[in-house]
Amino acid sequence: MNKYFFIGIGGISMSAIALILKNQGFWVEGSDMQESATTKMLRENGINVYIGHDESHIHGDETVIYTAAISKDNPELLAAKRMNLKIYERAEFLGLLMKDFKNVITISGTHGKTTTTSMIGYILKKANYNPTVLVGAFVKQLGGNFVIGSKEYLVVEACEYVDSFLKFNPTIGVILNIDNDHLDYFKDIDSIKNSFKKFAQKIPTSGFLVVNYDDKNVKDIINQLNTQIICISTKEKTDIFADNISCSDGYYEFDVKNNNDEILAHIKLNIPGFHNVYNALAAFAVASKLGVESITIEQALSEFRGASRRLEKVGEFNGIYLYDDYAHHPTEIKATLATLKKISEGKVLAIFQPHTFSRLKTLLNEFAESLQLADKVIVTDVYAAREKNVFGITSEKLYLKLKEIGIDCEYISNFEDIACYAVKEAKKGDIIATIGAGDINKCLDIILKKAVVKS
């Protein structure tokens, strides 16, 4: 029996891959730095998880898969190298796994991957296509961050960071948008566009590629591709486009039309935000091309309730609404705040935790500009993730920049202090929103506890 060991098994993607292999009958175990809901769930599914990394965990007869987040001197990785074991980085191994599937649907883009992947997975599940789905967040309607199905359809996010998606073997692709991000790896927007072009070129002539025709950077790269291209738009008549778009309290509905101006469906989204119109169009285009009936797609998209940490309403107290969003790029923050302003007539208090020093340094001015949409901003310390601060940047610089352009803001480092301030500051009808890809959502739990004590 093949054996697999996952270094960093608690990660959202690593855990899903581990469970797929376990479901296929393989021996699987792994390690992670700390206990979590994910490690608990893995154990419940029969996977042994070590807490902490130690060379004794590697027995010498397994294939080792590691996440890019671990250090090069990880003792388990070093032990595997000494033993000359087969070793794969996560994306590389996922690319190999894709060869087992007939239709591999890969969703790329700087923004919107998780939601669109979830939408496509949910549509195919509802249509009884029995898909296997890997998604970068917990999705209630999918029962988690993965669905184990047949080998007919695999639906998976395709991230451009460190060119990960170039290790994939897709048959169907989606490019939602291309924006300036991951500039700790990419030199500039042209190098990002070049990476996406290489990804698009991986789609075989027998497959197809769905692209956002309203995105200039996407438009720049789709020339001279040998695969079938399906264009989506909210602005002009393309292969699949949205028409008669209307909005009520941040929630959108629209007709889906083809390039003959025929109405294919009417979608009434149950998740807020104009950006989700594009995500829904992409999901519609993929599912429709795969033969799912329009009425089934319409029903699924209208039922879809979103993924965790994607404009997620977490709770409320005293008429004050609490939202959490994973936005960690200025474009995403603008979309999030614009949507929140439509949801309630009250003020929006944004609690922002920058994600990585490199991103904050590169996009400092853009972050300041995007946060102007909030009525009040609390900035807290940078969530370092994989980085050390060798960039000479701190959250205080963002705070000072916001002050400089006249934004009502505070810099508060401690989550307890943030919660106290937010509970005191917010009034009935207001929205408190945590924004960032780190652990800033923990603030909302503290806020709810303090609100109960206060009331």
UniProtKB/Swiss-Prot annotation:
Chain residues that bind ATP: G109, T110, H111, G112, K113, T114, T115
GO cellular component, one term: cytoplasm
InterPro entries: Mur-like_cat_sf, Mur_ligase_C, Mur_ligase_C_dom_sf, Mur_ligase_cen, Mur_ligase_N, MurCDEF_pg_biosynth, UDP-N-AcMur_Ala_ligase_MurC
Gene Ontology process terms (BP): cell division; cell wall organization; peptidoglycan biosynthetic process; regulation of cell shape
Entry superkingdom: Bacteria
Pathway: Cell wall biogenesis; peptidoglycan biosynthesis
One Pfam family, short name: Mur_ligase_C
Enzyme Commission no: 6.3.2.8
PANTHER family the UniProt entry points to: UDP-N-ACETYLMURAMATE--L-ALANINE LIGASE (PTHR43445:SF3), UDP-N-ACETYLMURAMATE--L-ALANINE LIGASE-RELATED (PTHR43445)
Function, in words: Cell wall formation.
Full protein name: UDP-N-acetylmuramate--L-alanine ligase
Organism: Caldicellulosiruptor bescii (strain ATCC BAA-1888 / DSM 6725 / KCTC 15123 / Z-1320) (Anaerocellum thermophilum)
